[in-house]
């Protein structure tokens, strides 16, 4: 056998999980079992299979074309891209230019910092969470940043209450969407944020049950950053801490592992937490914490190539807050 052909067969078979579109019916039955899926009717099952088949074709194509990342059948594979975005993200777009937070312009070239940096290695990032079908990514990303700020300042990890933001933030729209910097504004207006244990996550809009006596974090000031260079995020990340950023999530839905090189940039719809950066096989990348549980991606994280505005990571101003 030709050595090149043999290499390609081994490479594709290893990296793409050797999915075969002709085996879609068999994969679908395995999917139903593995993810405990049940449908209300035969017509609904057929509808979901057609979506699954379309997603499988996309997964196969991505595994062939984006050779530094791997994509797989996962819990979202019977949902259309629009369904996944509408149910499992939640970033809104501002109707006007809102600058409650102080705007800082960073127009100098990036410093010569370390090639790799990861706040997780310093134990300053809380565990991966799962927002479920509540569109509150904005709350998770913002509070993820505050959790890290608290850990940096007090050397202690604490989980904050996304549910408090969902119920009591009247600037944003709870499970129907919100913004990153306005979430900081809401925490400042409320006077603080409670721990998750005191105000547990329910994944739906509820009545505000604020208890100021149980605030564990209070926000002094918030900032938004204008970056002339995407690489400047490295300096900001090291100096400030993990940063909530906005992305287009449509191309990460079926992600499994690796560095994403090709990622849609058609409109921001999701918020995630930037926690680090590194280099793999000569390709620099960002490390991002998602809110789709540890059974997605790299134990809940994903990586995208730097300096190509992957997933639109540079389209919206990153933000941070200073805590008391």
Swiss-Prot record:
GO terms for biological process: proteolysis. Residues 1-18 form the signal peptide. GO terms for molecular function: cysteine-type peptidase activity. SUPFAM superfamilies: Cysteine proteinases (SSF54001). Its EC number is 3.4.22.50. Keywords: Disulfide bond, Glycoprotein, Hydrolase, Protease, Signal, Thiol protease, Zymogen. It is an enzyme of class 3 (hydrolase). PROSITE patterns: THIOL_PROTEASE_ASN, THIOL_PROTEASE_CYS, THIOL_PROTEASE_HIS. Disulfide bonds join 134-175, 168-208, 263-311. It comes from the Viruses. Synthesized as an inactive proenzyme and activated by proteolytic removal of the inhibitory propeptide. Glycans are attached at residue 159. It catalyses: Endopeptidase of broad specificity, hydrolyzing substrates of both cathepsin L and cathepsin B. The active site is at 137, 270, 290. PANTHER family: CYSTEINE PROTEASE FAMILY C1-RELATED (PTHR12411). Belongs to the peptidase C1 family. This is Viral cathepsin. The gene is Vcath.
């Amino acid at each position: 056998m030709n050595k090149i052909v043999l290499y390609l067969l081994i490479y594709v078979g290893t990296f793409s999980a050797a999915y075969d579109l002709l085996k879609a019916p068999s994969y679908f039955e395995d999917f139903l079992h593995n993810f405990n899926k049940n449908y209300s009717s035969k017509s609904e099952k057929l509808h979901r299979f057609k979506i699954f088949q379309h997603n499988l074709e996309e997964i196969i194509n991505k595994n062939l074309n984006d050779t530094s990342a791997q994509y797989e059948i996962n819990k979202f594979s019977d949902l259309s891209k629009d369904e996944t975005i509408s149910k499992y993200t939640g970033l809104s777009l501002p109707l006007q230019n809102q600058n409650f937070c102080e705007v800082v312009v960073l127009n100098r070239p990036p410093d010569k910092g370390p090639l790799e940096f990861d706040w997780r290695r310093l134990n300053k990032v809380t565990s991966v969470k799962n927002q479920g079908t509540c569109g509150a990514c904005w709350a998770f990303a913002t509070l993820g940043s505050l959790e890290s700020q608290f850990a940096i300042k007090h050397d202690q990890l604490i989980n904050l209450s996304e549910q408090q933001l969902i119920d009591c933030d009247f600037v944003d729209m709870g499970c129907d969407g919100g913004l990153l910097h306005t979430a900081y504004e809401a925490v400042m207006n409320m006077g603080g944020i409670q721990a998750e244990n005191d105000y547990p996550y329910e994944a739906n809009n509820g009545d505000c049950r604020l208890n100021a006596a149980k605030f564990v974090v209070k926000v002094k000031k918030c900032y938004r950053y204008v970056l002339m260079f995407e690489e400047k995020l490295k300096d900001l990340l090291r100096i400030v801490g993990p940063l909530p950023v906005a992305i287009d999530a449509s191309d990460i839905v079926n992600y499994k592992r690796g560095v994403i090189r090709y990622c849609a940039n058609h409109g921001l719809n999701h918020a995630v937490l930037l926690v680090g950066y590194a280099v793999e096989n000569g390709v620099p990348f960002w490390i991002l914490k998602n809110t789709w549980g540890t059974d997605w991606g790299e134990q809940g994280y994903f990586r995208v190539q730097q300096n190509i505005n992957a997933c639109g990571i540079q389209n919206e101003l990153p933000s941070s807050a200073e805590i008391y």
